[in-house]
């Protein structure tokens, strides 16, 4: 069992440390760009790296509740929103990098000089990409992440009501599945490990839900007995 931490220690020490650690991938990307550590296609490296970091933070977000169950460390829940927001942040950077580097930067200079024409060409290219399942699934994952990030605050939880908020935030599981498929589709070697991690976390969730259901049924039997 992990002992409780004071709110002051979490707010002043641990949260800034977690925030800084969560931003470290950006610092490493900037460093690699400045020191020319990227391969022949640096833009592709940025797109891939931010995509994987979004998936990693998604895995961490899903792991927080099981970690609380297994360790009794309830204070860890205070970090879930921040980690989830970083998952959306890296997903946003991943999507923006794809649009800017893979699509907009690939246009002829004369086309880029005309904003409306460049926008039309870029949207046309994105529309063509969406006919490919790999891109379409990635867009679905990002679109589902947006309402989760927008409603992750305590204030939004109160506005929606606890039950509706919980139902909405179960979208994290379709997001996880879509993210794995988006990663796995191009046969990326690292994708299976994330599938295993998310699968194990999902099994833990199911086991916890089953145990709670049995406990609830047992209490009902005792109450009626």
Question: Language-model features: where?
Answer:
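Membrane-embedded alpha-helical bundles that constitute the cytochrome b-like, heme-associated redox core
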Residues: 1-225
């Amino acid at each position: 069992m992990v002992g409780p931490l004071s709110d002051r220690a979490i707010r002043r020490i641990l949260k800034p440390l977690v925030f800084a650690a969560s931003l470290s991938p950006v610092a490493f990307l900037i460093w690699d760009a400045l020191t020319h550590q990227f391969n022949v296609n640096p833009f592709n490296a940025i797109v891939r790296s931010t995509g994987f970091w979004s998936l990693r933070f998604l895995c961490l977000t899903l792991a927080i509740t099981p970690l609380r169950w297994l360790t009794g460390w309830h204070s860890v829940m205070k970090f879930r929103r921040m980690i989830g927001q970083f998952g959306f942040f890296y997903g946003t950077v991943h999507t923006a990098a794809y649009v800017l580097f893979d699509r907009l930067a690939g246009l002829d200079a004369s086309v880029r000089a005309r904003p409306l024409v460049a926008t039309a060409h870029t949207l046309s290219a994105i529309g063509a990409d969406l006919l490919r399942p790999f891109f379409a699934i990635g867009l679905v994952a990002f679109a589902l992440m947006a309402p989760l990030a927008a409603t992750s605050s305590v204030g939004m939880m109160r506005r929606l009501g606890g039950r509706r908020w919980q139902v909405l935030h179960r979208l994290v599981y379709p997001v996880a599945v879509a993210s794995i498929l988006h990663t796995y589709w191009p046969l990326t070697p690292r994708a299976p490990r994330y599938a295993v991690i998310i699968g194990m976390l999902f099994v833990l969730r199911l086991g916890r839900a089953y145990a709670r259901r049995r406990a609830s049924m047992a209490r009902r039997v005792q109450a009626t007995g």
